[in-house]
């Protein structure tokens, strides 16, 4: 299952690379696609989702070396399978759309990426099966306790981050508390209602964990701090997305995986 999740992640990364290269060479309305504000926003958001997905995938792998790793992997692997495989479909579809007719025809190979990506959410457990597996890990093995502890650990590291990242860490902490509350409610609601909310619970867990991991990374790398801030504004507090200017002011360098000095990162983080 983890291997299939990484297949989805690999297709997402390859598709993003194709999209980024195309955007730096293809012109429309006399400008490169990457310089069109809407396209740059879309590329940065795909990049941020990719960074969050890589953080989650690497966490699943690293869990093998932790004392609580068995419970972490038990709950994070099915959750990662949902997110990473779906991301492969989303990013490959976006890339086909960005290429237009060239993306749809067979000459460029993008449709092959999309066809393969569509297989992965089904392979080794559909999204519904994986969501129910997350629920099972919570109910039977209390695996959420390991997740909450890992989130707390990441937030402790992020506490040493630059001040402009505080907005993101507070959003993650709020989601962490909400996740704990929703898990506690499982003991007082009936089985059918619990199953009905499995997808929502998995999504809440994913956003919380990915946000925490990005904040942890952002404590030591300014460009990662911008990624964490963009992720929190888009995925954890979407009302802030309307004012976010990270893609507008620093999107080109983020797409190119350029390094940022702390001063420039703080300027880009301002809304």
Residue ranges: model-predicted function:
Residues 1-271:
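Flavin-dependent oxidoreductase catalytic core characteristic
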């Amino acid at each position: 299952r983890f291997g299939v999740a990484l297949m989805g992640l690999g297709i997402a990364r390859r598709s993003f690379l194709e999209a980024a290269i195309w955007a730096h060479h293809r012109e429309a309305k006399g400008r490169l696609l990457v310089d069109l504000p809407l396209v740059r926003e879309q590329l940065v958001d795909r990049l941020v989702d990719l960074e969050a997905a890589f953080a989650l995938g690497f966490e699943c792998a690293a869990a093998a070396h932790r004392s609580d790793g068995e419970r972490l992997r038990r709950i994070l692997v099915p959750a990662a399978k949902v997110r990473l495989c779906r991301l492969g479909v989303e990013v490959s579809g976006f890339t086909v759309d960005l290429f237009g007719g060239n993306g749809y025809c067979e000459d460029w190979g993008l449709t092959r990426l999309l066809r393969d990506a569509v297989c992965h959410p089904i392979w080794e457990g559909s999204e519904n099966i994986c969501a129910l597996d997350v629920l099972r890990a919570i109910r039977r093995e209390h695996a959420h306790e390991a997740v909450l502890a890992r989130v707390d650990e990441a937030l402790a590291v992020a506490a040493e981050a630059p001040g402009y990242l505080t907005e993101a860490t507070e959003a993650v902490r709020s989601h962490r508390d909400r996740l704990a509350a929703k898990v506690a409610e499982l003991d007082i609601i009936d089985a059918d209602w619990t199953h009905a909310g499995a997808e929502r619970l998995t999504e809440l867990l994913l956003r919380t964990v990915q946000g925490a991991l990005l904040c942890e990374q952002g404590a030591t790398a300014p460009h990662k701090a911008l990624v964490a801030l963009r992720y929190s504004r888009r995925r954890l507090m979407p009302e802030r997305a309307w004012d976010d200017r990270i893609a507008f002011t620093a999107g080109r360098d983020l797409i190119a995986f350029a390094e940022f000095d702390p001063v420039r990162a703080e300027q880009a983080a301002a809304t």
